[in-house]
Amino acid sequence: MKRASELNYTIHHLCIYDDQPRENMWPYLRWHHGITNYFSGAVFHVTGEGHSDYTFLGVGGHAYQIQIEAPPFQFEYERNWWRDHGHGYNHICWVTSNARASMDHLLANGATEVMPFEEFPTYDGFVVHDPEGRWIEVMEYTDEYFKVQEFTHAPAGECGLEMIGNAEVCADVEAMVEWYQEVMDLRILGRYENVVDTVVYLTDKDHDPETRNTVLILQNARQDFEKNHMAEHGPYISAIVYQARHVQRAFEDALWAGMKELQAPQVDPLTGALTAYLREPCGGNVLMLTERLKP
């Protein structure tokens, strides 16, 4: 069996379930984002059911993106999740150099199957739960030409906005930090903790502090809105993470674009970073906007 370090994992995108993607992409576009790809119909339809409707967007940073996916979905497990949870952050997708070996490795190390390994026309892939139940999709590009397009590193707007990753609320932060290091080959960028709260920044093998500052933040439920969501849904993908050179300006731009205020910029007492929280349009999920941390 291959080791995690041999599977070349990189964090690729977050999938958001939403039934009005054409309308709800506009606040993102007004907030300095751009579309990297739109897949629909036969372009990316790999099953005999449902349909594909995928809008990929990003801003400022290299590689990391979001994908708005609309029903009716191609897979039964997707329709079941939509039935149970509705609008939400469904899964984080990772790219690997060997999807078949990746699934064997993950299932042997605490993950549980959601969608079995399948070979599709342009990629091989599968979906699993991590040990706390959050969805992980893993894909391996197999077509010579097909690949979701990427932005170069170019912080956007006068505020210097970059989408850099996701936060996840965990039931056991330490156990999940250990799991993502050992099983998904992540490494710790920074750790912030007191007697109550723990926040750990992790990244993948391709991290570059200037041009590819992709992060996965693992933490306990700290804010009231996180505690409420955790109580209803359990451990979950809690926020899209942005960094900006000018947080206040980026926050004002977000409000103008149509995002909703959850918390105006203030210094996070744990990390020491100026941080704001907003709700985005695809069901009111959370956006975390912070100044750049330098662990």
List PLM regions with ranges.
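Core segments of cupin and vicinal oxygen chelate
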Residues: 4-9, 15-65, 108, 116-120, ...
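Short beta->alpha transition motifs characteristic of CBS
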Residues: 119, 138-145, 220-222, 289-295
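Vicinal oxygen chelate
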Residues: 9-21, 53-64, 77-105, 124-129, ...
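Generic structural signal for well-ordered beta-strand positions
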Residues: 114, 136, 189, 262, ...
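Hydrophobic, ordered structural segments
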Residues: 74, 90-102, 108-145
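C-terminal functional regions that serve as terminal interaction/effector modules
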Residues: 209-214, 219, 239-256, 260, ...
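Short, charged/polar, Gly/Pro-enriched secondary-structure boundary elements
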Residues: 63-66, 76, 133-136, 207-216, ...
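Surface-exposed beta-loop interaction hotspot
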Residues: 129-174
